[in-house]
Amino acid sequence: MMLKTVLRLPVCAALLALAAGCAMIPPEPVVTGPLTAPPPPPPQPSARPNGSIYQPSAYGNYPLFEDRRPRNVGDIVTIVLEEKTNAAKGVATNTSRDGSATLGVAAAPRFMDGVINDKLDTDISGGNTANGTGKSSANNTFTGTITTTVIGVLPNGNLQIAGEKQIAINRGSEYVRFSGVVDPRSITGSNTVSSTRVADARIEYRSKGVMDEVQTMGWLQRFFLIASPF
């Protein structure tokens, strides 16, 4: 009885390891790193007198005639998502090969009479033909808006931006993540910039919940899909 129990333990452990290997693997995120960068607390400035027309306290850190476009860590930038890609590819391959050979023997040994009729003529021919075609196409469209935060300023003045938007509806949730590098001169007066003008742009749109689970193949199906040789 003890021997049977000892033998069953490795089998159970192997089955558990196999089931764990077939478990659902979460997708790797496209956008990595911090998604927001709260600015450090500014030093306490000395009290400034307020005039009768212009009051500095009402404008925060922005002077009266300063451009309001983002330039510091912690400023926000609205990204207008305008991504559209179309790709198509076609491949065709045709190959053929023919060959032939003839072998003749004028006379054969007497003990083989009646079998090959005193003469051996052999013709060999062969052919090989292969045809292959393939086509692939992809169309993607992604539109919307997301407000990001400046998380860093490069030495040349370009801004590193990143942001995330999460939406939870009933039992499911969706999130959009964005990161990249933008030139401050590309930002419009309304504090927006098109995603097509962002360098090193990384856009991630995923969902969690019932709809995501429905679109995922079960672990047992994945096991048979991997183990099946066909």
From Swiss-Prot:
GO terms for biological process: bacterial-type flagellum-dependent cell motility. Residues 34-53 are annotated as: Disordered. InterPro entries: Flag_Lring. Pfam families: FlgH. One of its GO terms (cellular component) is bacterial-type flagellum basal body, distal rod, L ring. It is found in: Cell outer membrane; Bacterial flagellum basal body. Keywords: Bacterial flagellum, Cell outer membrane, Lipoprotein, Membrane, Palmitate, Signal. GO terms for molecular function: cytoskeletal motor activity. A lipid is attached at residue 22 (N-palmitoyl cysteine). Residues 1-21 form the signal peptide. The basal body constitutes a major portion of the flagellar organelle and consists of four rings (L,P,S, and M) mounted on a central rod. Belongs to the FlgH family. This is Flagellar L-ring protein. It comes from Bordetella parapertussis (strain 12822 / ATCC BAA-587 / NCTC 13253).
